[in-house]
Regions:
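Conserved glycine-bearing catalytic or ligand-binding loops at nucleotide- and phosphate-handling centers
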Residues: 67-101
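Short, hydrophobic beta-strand segments
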Residues: 1-11, 45-56
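Charged, low-hydrophobicity low-complexity segments
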Residues: 1-40, 97, 120
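Short, non-transmembrane amphipathic alpha-helical segments
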Residues: 21-24, 61-78, 161-162
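Short beta-strand elements
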Residues: 32-42, 77-84, 173-175
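Ordered, soluble secondary-structure elements with a strong preference for glycine-centered loop motifs
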Residues: 11-19, 57-65, 146-155
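Short, charged/polar, Gly/Pro-enriched secondary-structure boundary elements
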Residues: 56-58, 98-104
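P-loop NTPase catalytic phosphate-binding loop
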Residues: 36, 85-90, 94, 113-194
Length: 194
């Protein structure tokens, strides 16, 4: 879990694909008489977001209505269109990466100053689209509900939360009571001092 983070082998594949898909995206929009400029590309762990700026006079709703056409033209499983991006003069179009890049716990932990004890209940949830560490303070949440379909990552999320707490607190600072009806998910934590 805290092994050294290997070099990202998927980055080159996703960077090359993003360049091709970005050019193709502008061409697809042009085919539907939408003139736009690609202004930025953000490659995240699972999706790539293209920020495009349509020419003056292009209705945002016209771009939204092209989701299925964009999906087919780019030959991707899904497309998400954020029109407009809040606070920006642009439209965001997200497509899945060819290769997903796993987010390692060591990457997240290394972003936090180990000497900073002001947020002992800070938990690591992953990375956002821009690759920034996503954290939240468990002590500031009145409630926390984790739900999802089978195989969607609920147990991975719980393990990330528990590991975050174990890495940042001492046994006299946090006590845990874990209830595991299946007697499978939390067995690795059976002998923790917390």
């Amino acid at each position: 879990m805290l092994d050294p983070v290997p070099a990202r082998s998927n980055d080159d594949v996703n960077v090359n694909a993003a360049k091709e898909k970005g050019e193709l995206l502008i061409q697809v929009l042009s085919n539907f008489d939408i003139k736009a400029t690609l202004i930025d590309t953000h490659i995240g762990p699972a999706v790539t977001k293209f920020e495009i700026r349509p020419e003056v006079g292009v209705k945002v709703s016209k771009i939204l209505n092209l989701a299925d056409d964009i999906k087919m033209s780019l030959a991707v499983k899904d497309v998400r269109i954020e029109a407009p991006i809040p606070g920006h003069n642009a439209v965001g179009i997200e497509i899945p990466n060819i290769k997903t890049t796993p987010v390692k716990m060591k990457e997240l932990v290394s972003k936090i100053d180990p000497g900073d004890k002001s947020k002992p209940l800070l938990i690591f949830l992953g990375k956002d689209l821009l690759g920034n560490c996503v954290t939240c303070r468990l002590d500031k949440m009145p409630h926390l509900l984790i739900a999802g379909a089978t195989g969607s990552g609920k147990s991975v999320c719980m393990n990330s939360i528990i590991t975050s707490l174990l890495l940042r607190t001492k046994p006299d600072e946090v006590k845990m009571l874990l209830i595991d009806p299946k007697k499978v998910e939390f067995t690795p934590y059976h002998k923790i001092p917390h």
